[in-house]
Amino acid sequence: MADLEVYKNLSPEKVERCMSVMQSGTQMIKLKRGTKGLVRLFYLDEHRTRLRWRPSRKSEKAKILIDSIYKVTEGRQSEIFHRQAEGNFDPSCCFTIYHGNHMESLDLITSNPEEARTWITGLKYLMAGISDEDSLAKRQRTHDQWVKQTFEEADKNGDGLLNIEEIHQLMHKLNVNLPRRKVRQMFQEADTDENQGTLTFEEFCVFYKMMSLRRDLYLLLLSYSDKKDHLTVEELAQFLKVEQKMNNVTTDYCLDIIKKFEVSEENKVKNVLGIEGFTNFMRSPACDIFNPLHHEVYQDMDQPLCNYYIASSHNTYLTGDQLLSQSKVDMYARVLQEGCRCVEVDCWDGPDGEPVVHHGYTLTSKILFRDVVETINKHAFVKNEFPVILSIENHCSIQQQRKIAQYLKGIFGDKLDLSSVDTGECKQLPSPQSLKGKILVKGKKLPYHLGDDAEEGEVSDEDSADEIEDECKFKLHYSNGTTEHQVESFIRKKLESLLKESQIRDKEDPDSFTVRALLKATHEGLNAHLKQSPDVKESGKKSHGRSLMTNFGKHKKTTKSRSKSYSTDDEEDTQQSTGKEGGQLYRLGRRRKTMKLCRELSDLVVYTNSVAAQDIVDDGTTGNVLSFSETRAHQVVQQKSEQFMIYNQKQLTRIYPSAYRIDSSNFNPLPYWNAGCQLVALNYQSEGRMMQLNRAKFKANGNCGYVLKPQQMCKGTFNPFSGDPLPANPKKQLILKVISGQQLPKPPDSMFGDRGEIIDPFVEVEIIGLPVDCCKDQTRVVDDNGFNPVWEETLTFTVHMPEIALVRFLVWDHDPIGRDFVGQRTVTFSSLVPGYRHVYLEGLTEASIFVHITINEIYGKWSPLILNPSYTILHFLGATKNRQLQGLKGLFNKNPRHSSSENNSHYVRKRSIGDRILRRTASAPAKGRKKSKMGFQEMVEIKDSVSEATRDQDGVLRRTTRSLQARPVSMPVDRNLLGALSLPVSETAKDIEGKENSLAEDKDGRRKGKASIKDPHFLNFNKKLSSSSSALLHKDTSQGDTIVSTAHMSVTGEQLGMSSPRGGRTTSNATSNCQENPCPSKSLSPKQHLAPDPVVNPTQDLHGVKIKEKGNPEDFVEGKSILSGSVLSHSNLEIKNLEGNRGKGRAATSFSLSDVSMLCSDIPDLHSTAILQESVISHLIDNVTLTNENEPGSSISALIGQFDETNNQALTVVSHLHNTSVMSGHCPLPSLGLKMPIKHGFCKGKSKSSFLCSSPELIALSSSETTKHATNTVYETTCTPISKTKPDDDLSSKAKTAALESNLPGSPNTSRGWLPKSPTKGEDWETLKSCSPASSPDLTLEDVIADPTLCFNSGESSLVEIDGESENLSLTTCEYRREGTSQLASPLKLKYNQGVVEHFQRGLRNGYCKETLRPSVPEIFNNIQDVKTQSISYLAYQGAGFVHNHFSDSDAKMFQTCVPQQSSAQDMHVPVPKQLAHLPLPALKLPSPCKSKSLGDLTSEDIACNFESKYQCISKSFVTTGIRDKKGVTVKTKSLEPIDALTEQLRKLVSFDQEDNCQVLYSKQDANQLPRALVRKLSSRSQSRVRNIASRAKEKQEANKQKVPNPSNGAGVVLRNKPSAPTPAVNRHSTGSYIAGYLKNTKGGGLEGRGIPEGACTALHYGHVDQFCSDNSVLQTEPSSDDKPEIYFLLRL
């Protein structure tokens, strides 16, 4: 480019003269190969960005971007000119433009020399300007050009104006899906001149700005500007420091940004940055994802050559395929300037004694060796000074070898002189720094045993050209008189069809391994063709050609098991030995060839002596370069990886593509980089995935062609295939929040072009590196919006060796039948910059995605529990040591598949078409789908050696679940939190055993459970786990040990983390104990209170065994997270038939969500380590879920105006899926003195920030799945007094498990909860639906599951259509029921609940009950004051709008905005919990931890009901002196609600007179008016079975009804008459269950001796906790006034 310098200094007059001539157009002759010249009018477009011509049949393609012009040459220099006879054209009228990746040439002839001179000058001037401009200027220029071009293309009639119809068409083309009225409104606002109804270009610019206002950036600006519409210098500096993690931010730097990017002159004067300037800044290279410092060389360049990866090219001279393409010297210039440092020259004897360069035995064109050397000399060091390696493949005679040596010395001169190079210590290669400006010749060297006087000698002739088998070589002499032209046309025809097919299939297909084994096919076809007589009939040729095509197919990889070599190239395999004989591994079966080499050429080879790849034995000589074809190299990597790595620490290795890649496709370089190979040679002329990876790898370090290998690869032993390759080193955690996309185009190969449908984009992020790091994950699909889609999703990855990892962003257009590639960008992990960044897609002008990046370091073995959501529990159970655990057959199992369905739960199956069609926005490769491991060719090729099971075990490829991340990704990790992790031994043996038998089987023994544990790995794991934790079972529960169990992610991968508060002491903060108690031995089993009976199975889904979708064994619901290790609170559970169920291996206990909740409550803590000090903006973006992407203002409006966040308030912004009004407000939850604000979360989706509010009371939380709209669950925390009964009283007596030791009123912590301020995402509130009762003794999981209300947020529509992957707990749980696996749903409950929840849901969705009933907030809170044993179902809140409007500014009455009217059967009285904890929880994608029978499998033993008697039996543990006296008092309610008998028992036991001022939240409504659409109807079979069960149970109860109630009996009493009472009770669960116990007499320590269910609360005034509560408000406990008897069913599952 040096010659362009001259053109930068041309006088403006001359430049303008050139430009005007070029823009007005010039008639020239365009020469084409094999045709006569065509006369065309060539002109420069008005933006001076494109050279165009007309007429042209393909007007769209008749253009050349100035940016893509590589060089312009004068005269007749190109090959096409050379083919023309001398004298045909005047050389001074000729010039050639080289452009594009393949160096295509456009050969032009003008009518006179003057015109040619003008064009050459003008083009070179434009090229010089482009080459000189900085990246910012270029970005601005290309943007301006793009807008102008867009305007012109939209202006169909060419009048320079756009009317509304043209605007609508443009919107479709730009993938904008806005309502027409909105477009018209913006159009009218922009149309300001007198010419109404049309837009000029200036007006269009205004319109375009309005249309493309970045809501995400606007929110970002607001959050840092204190809600102003601009940033001051100080605010900008704060943003750069806090969010963008920039150091040394000075005032001058900020002023410079304002000066450079601000558009408004007024703002510039005030030194503030408005939204337009801020947008320009954020879209500039300064905020690109790639670290700008890495545009320069920044690595240490003084290490030996073998410590670097070196950018290498294969058959550099070719412009296309390996058989027929043109060879051009310009390719050398191009690749050298692209940063390539090792080029290949194939030398052959040429005519006239001149060696030529071409691909031997093929029909590629020839170029002179001398021209090649001159080009290399000219361009080698233009871009950088680091050494160039010239890989000479020598096939010449001795005479021409001497000519080669002569040219090299004569042209390169001193560049070949290596005498001055300092090699450092002995036997070490020199460094790139010491070789600057030098050219190394890589070639054969005469053996040392020859004397120095020997002029020539024999050397082996093993090289890539000779990989072509002799019978496949094209000899250019033909016995039957066939001409070369005939042969060439025959081959060309075959090859073109082949290449076309190859291109079609080469779209990012991980299994595609482009053409191979084709030379032979071609050769056979050729011979058959040649055997025919030259005058063979046309028809004969045709049919023959057709039959030959079968040989030309591009074959999918069909590797068998890894026990065979990986290679799919059968032909090559036959040439290679099996490798059984040591040392002979790579010796080819054929004879070794030799050739003569002259001394002159041998002497030029110094540090790069090519040796035949016989074996990787280091003979002690430095300077040997081993050359392998990809297939041979693959065998070495696979079978001798550690030896190979050690060899590569001292010597160079070059890997080149297989000779069967005749289409010049590229192999995957990754396995060879991982093995330490330095020179991995690719076909630079072939664009595609592999070249993109190569470009990304070398772009770092200033694109100088040398990238330092990680130190572990440079010394010592290192096994790249290990599951934990660097156990002692910290790992990196990448938390990547994909926020939005901008101007994503339609797919390049879209059938209808711009007229095609608006795209439905999603983003896939892939980590490419060591096998253990390779994985990918993706966002959900956004429908119909390519212009500004918003995903707001967080993906988390853990990387063991970030130095070699690449991060690849892919944008796809989702399609029911597949997906179309839109664009990509690949960046090295080490070049990522934290903060808010734009990822510009390669080769697309405006298209980008906006992300937030956080990179944390993870230290120590246990740290993945906290920070890395992708660790499986297996890693911690020592799977690496006990390989038999997963049937490991040794480290290198030869199974090539990514995973196999039989032995790996990670197996990703292809989805059926029907399945895909159902998944739209909830949808597509939706977020619910797990990260597929190594779903690309790389991994297959490299990891053939590692069995999938091994990988899972070792924690490899484990990233199947979404991030645990709960904080804005900008948050630094607080390392202090890492200290107190405990061992994850909290599951008990019982949990495990139950798990094994968790399948519900119907009478025929058919499996109904969707989560069968087939995998023996799980069973082994279970046993191991149980043994490790069973010891914990027998602790005396009366000590009040706090049990908090580990909830870990499913096998799909994630560890939620765990905590183990210390036993035997009162804790005010369940989670804080986690930090205080580092002693793992104190970790109590979640079920320590259980007797060691195998019947209890709370953690059945511990591993997240997948639930299959109905009827389709192929489709897994790939649960992202699983709520497991749940604590079963026996206070809520009645264990009925332990013995009977033990036999069946069933869980005999009904499972309360609270138990789960409790369990999970601590989990976040661990994660929280990653999350301290939130940055406001992350909250913002986190909080605003732009659900309705099509409404430009929707999210902003949701956020702005609700920004008054105080320390004691949590901002809640709700942007609802169902387009209900978006409300937000402040949650009146003051921060209660915390030692450390820990955030925790496992919100995989968007929700990131929320605090666990763990009060002295029990923390209970339920797991909810984050849908595409992340959800944070809200928990209620209640204080449970611990039962003092003896541990052996009864199983139930141990029920206090999950309860924290209560802080009774006298205790100092009584009133203190742990509730830091926590912005939560809007949708996080919606999780309430799934996280119903926080510690509810009465709401069992069945309530959640059976209650469609929970599904409010699931999918975007009715349950029926939702695919299992939609990640809502509510959805999923409902799905279980739908599928007949209702995990704990009582059939009758189902029936009762149906109406309510559906109605409830509809009410919420339609918002029709805004004003139904509005008790004052204080009243509602009053009702809470005295609740002792109760947890509130947040469902009710949700329904009540409490959550939705959480005290929004606009709605002080608030609590009722969305209260649906309920039927009489559903009077939900909703007490409000003392505190809300917002905890993003992994969802219950997997079956609930306590497994139940499916509805069809219930038997009469499972249900006990009594329609007449009073409470028949009470669990002994609940009865204490305080209760016995009150036992007669009963509570009435108005409805025939399906109430949990157990709850009812509790309620009866602990209930006291209610006071009178509580209002009913739900008014009556006829049950039969309730909508029922969302609930699965029971089949007639199920209904009859339920009736049968009920009747049998009734008979049984009748028989027993005279018996005296036995307090310790586990049977359920199901009916009692209710005394009348004046007002309805507020104690009703949202599911209809009563909440046990309105304890009035608890002001003192009276509760000490009583066993209260785990959700119990002491009587506290709420004033100190909630601003909405008056200090003296007390919970009312009046019974309800309806005399109808109530029927209860108690399920024993």
Curated annotation (Swiss-Prot):
Binding site for Ca(2+) 2: 315, 344, 346, 393
Source organism of the structure: Homo sapiens
Main location as per UniProt: cytoplasm
Gene Ontology molecular function, alphabetical: calcium ion binding; calcium-dependent phospholipase C activity; phosphatidylinositol-4,5-bisphosphate phospholipase C activity
Protein name: 1-phosphatidylinositol 4,5-bisphosphate phosphodiesterase eta-1
CDD domains in alphabetical order: C2_PLC_like, EFh_PI-PLCeta1, PI-PLCc_eta1
Record gene name: PLCH1
Domain PI-PLC Y-box: 601-714
Binding residue positions for substrate: 442, 444, 627, 654
